[in-house]
Design a protein with these regions (language model features):
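Non-cytoplasmic
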Residues: 75, 128-179
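C-terminal transmembrane helix and the adjacent membrane-cytosol boundary/short C-terminal tail
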Residues: 35, 92, 169-222
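Transmembrane alpha-helices
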Residues: 14, 77, 110-142
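Ligand-binding "clamshell"
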Residues: 275, 291-322, 405, 417-431
Length: 499
């Protein structure tokens, strides 16, 4: 966790707060002055509040692409409810005598509302702003899922590796931010109530938000550089992307910028898009086939490798796979070492006699009906009949394994957490799971512009065995070493960087 991430989080919160104020105040005033528009406006802002945060961000991202703008607009929509409702309510509660006096002085309705009623209503309006800002601090955590940055990525990673100290630290920072901002706004609110809505004082807190936003602008800029890529939400992706940066910047004059965290699917969508917000990513030929292209391993012609088939399919996307890196990260089946010792488990087939005593666990994706690399085809292929099968969030899977929530789990072969929680990875003795080989996926236009990049990155081809990648991720996820430190040390060991 770094100060940059904290300031990024604050930037997102303040930007969304300013935008929600700019949109919410006029909507609230409109709802007050128009009895016809009022129920429509209030129902719309109520409806927006009921949409799950991730779903809303996903919808916006389809239109705007990943990044901070998607998050800011999403939080803005979420923040409208308290601002719009409190604005309308505050104006309704202004003393009728004051309204009548202003009317009697010949003031026009717009002038009365803006210059007389609104200043008196502002303490109530500001309560809505205060609620919106504090709520935005928590909602901004979801920025990590759409490449928006902030502290959400830290929390997600900490949950995945069961790092309670990091979870508490990141949560503590969010709580401190929320408490400090709430105390400051509470003080301003008290001052405004004492001044009975002085028109000058009411803009002081808004001006303070604007000033803080301006100071944080450097943390809201998008990626700039010759080559852009996103940080991953797994240490494996982070390690490989940092190796890209180190090698390219060491051997050329190009600048590589690693942007905010991004999931594999969203990274793919950004990579193939014409927005040029991403130039390359690490992935796996099998993942490209099944997850990105929406095909299945049975679609690969007999005698052709997944790698070669995928490359033919990628031509229409303007993308190229570089040479295979040596490691594969396919699905694997893991069991606690104690269970393996008790029953002498070495292969997946060894589970057949005891499957009816065991609970199977995997992320929800493994239980979907589409595709051959899923639960139903797997148990039918091996003749397994588990006592129960449960789904769990990918980030919580290893915690569930440690807690004994299930006995058999789907894992990834290079995940360093397998070693941490004491899982024995069983041999896929009947070869159900195909190898998913690690490859760099690069835009063709980048290779046309900088052809040397392919040669530089292909220096890693075949140099990272699966066991080596598992050890590298273990050093990051379990031993707590930084991604930069582990990546640099490995490149030095290969002779690709100087010590």
């Amino acid at each position: 966790m770094s100060w940059d991430l904290i300031f990024q989080h604050l930037f997102i919160v303040l930007a969304a707060s300013l935008l929600s104020i700019a949109v919410g105040l006029p909507l609230g005033i409109w709802a007050y002055v128009s009895k016809t528009a009022r129920p429509v406006i209030l129902r719309i802002v109520d409806l927006l509040q009921t949409i799950p945060s991730l779903a809303l961000l996903g919808i916006i991202m389809v239109v705007l692409d990943p990044g901070k703008l998607t998050v800011i607009i999403g939080i803005t929509l979420y923040s409208l409810l308290p601002i719009v409702r409190n604005t309308c309510l505050g104006l309704q509660e202004v003393d009728p005598g004051v309204k009548e006096a202003a009317r009697g002085m010949g003031m026009s309705k717009p002038y009365r509302v803006l210059m007389v009623e609104f200043p008196l209503a502002f303490p109530t309006v500001f309560t809505g702003i205060r609620i919106a800002v504090v709520n935005a601090i928590g909602t901004a955590v979801f920025a990590a899922f759409v490449g928006g940055g902030g502290l959400g990525g830290v929390i997600t990673q900490a949950i995945r590796i069961s790092d309670m100290s990091l979870i508490l630290a990141a949560t503590g920072v969010l709580m401190v931010i929320a408490v400090v901002l709430d105390l400051i706004m509470s003080w301003f609110e008290g001052q405004m109530r004492k001044s009975r809505g002085g028109s000058k004082k009411m803009w002081i807190p808004v001006a303070a938000i604007v000033l803080a936003f301006i100071l944080l602008l450097p943390y809201g800029r998008g990626g700039t550089g010759d080559i852009l890529l996103y940080d991953g939400d797994y240490s494996e992706t982070q390690l490989m992307h940092h190796m890209v940066k180190m090698l390219v910047e060491d051997q050329t004059d190009l600048t590589v910028t690693i942007q905010d965290q991004m999931s594999q699917v969203n990274n793919w969508n950004s990579l193939k898009d014409d927005s040029h917000t991403c130039d390359l990513m690490i992935s796996y030929d099998g993942t490209i086939l099944t997850t990105f292209l929406g095909q299945d391993t049975v679609d690969v012609p007999e005698g052709m490798t997944i790698y070669d088939y995928v490359q033919g399919e990628l031509d229409s996307y303007g993308l190229t796979q570089l040479e295979q890196l040596g490691f594969e990260n396919t699905y694997a089946i893991g069991v606690p070492q104690a269970l393996a010792d008790e029953y002498g488990l070495e292969t997946i087939s060894d589970l057949i006699p005891i499957a009816d005593q065991l609970t199977f666990g995997a992320e929800q994706e493994f239980f979907t009906l589409e595709g051959s690399m899923k639960y139903d085809p797997f148990v039918k292929f091996y003749g397994l009949n588990f006592q129960d099968a449960v789904s769990v969030d990918m980030g919580l899977k290893y915690s569930a394994i440690e807690n004994g929530s299930f006995d058999v789990a789907v894992v990834y072969s290079t995940d360093g957490l397998n070693k941490k929680v004491g899982l024995k990875v069983l041999e896929d003795d009947q070869s159900f799971f195909p190898d998913y080989n690690g490859v760099f996926l690069v835009r063709d236009d980048l290779l046309e512009k900088y052809p040397e990049v392919a040669d530089i990155l292909n220096q890693l081809a075949g140099k990272i065995p699966t066991e080596q990648m598992a050890e590298l991720t273990y050093q990051v996820d379990v031993e707590g070493r930084t991604v930069d430190e582990v990546a640099r040390e490995f490149l030095v060991s290969l002779g690709l960087l100087e010590a």
